[in-house]
Amino acid sequence: MKKNLYILSALFLAFSCNIARQISTSDFTPLNSFSQNCEGPAVDRKGQLYVVNYQKDGTVGRFQPDGKAEVFVTLPEGSTANAIRFDSRGDLLLADFSGHNILKINPETRAVSTFCHDIRFNQPNDICINRQDVIFASDPNWSNNTGQLWRIDKNGKATLLESGMGTTNGIELSPDEKTLYVNESIQRNVWAYSVSPDGQVSNKRLFFHFDDHGLDGMKCDRRGNLYVTRWGGGKIDVLSPDGKLIKSISTQGKQVSNLAFGGPDGRTVYVTLQDRKCVETFRN
């Protein structure tokens, strides 16, 4: 009997600890700090957070870890960014969906240039970049719920990797850069590809399918778990490297658009919310 009581007590304690460890978010920026296109969070080597469309469309905001904020750049007329990544030099690469470009920003001079423009682009939505500075870009056509997948080499040349996909949106590389993940917002699929260092993709397979809510930006943590923002669902779902749903993290807003990892240990998470027009944060 005592043994059974010990077992029950241990199970109750484990359950209680798990409840206590549930993650909750807090506001990193005030409500309504951004336009409704609040998106594209990325953290640089200094721990500074960059998010697009701060205060209004067509800007990039920069935030210190203590929350101090500024408009870092106003993009050229006709350009609206949706994603930010950093190359090996620390330059910012942006997916410019309204200008149909990949833009580059020098962080020291704040000069904006066009890194890639291709008339075949629908509207570049999200990007990721490997250690060889090869860019992968999702390119949806929201009018007919289709999408494309692109590779953009260091010389700015764009190569169409796949067309006829669903509504391509979130895109991410695994930490070892051997797997490329691409999701389809409307179809709720996450696809995985094998990828070589020079950006060749192969072995496409279905990594995970969701039954509800939209899919938006995705990021991997250092262990290779894939964090998928669930637009309209008010949560981030976390998938293990073998494609299992391991946890869900609730957000205060419903329209979760993207996330980024930061902090000295890489466990501070910044989340963009389009309905609340702000950034939420949590410790992972």
Predicted regions located by residue number:
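Beta-rich, blade/repeat-based domains predominating
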Residues: N32-L49, P76-D96, N101, D118-Q148, ...
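A short helix->beta-strand "capping" segment at the edge of beta-propeller domains
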Residues: I19-S35, K204
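Glycine- and Gly-Pro-enriched alpha-helical subdomains that act as flexible
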Residues: E172, K178-N189, P197, V201-K204
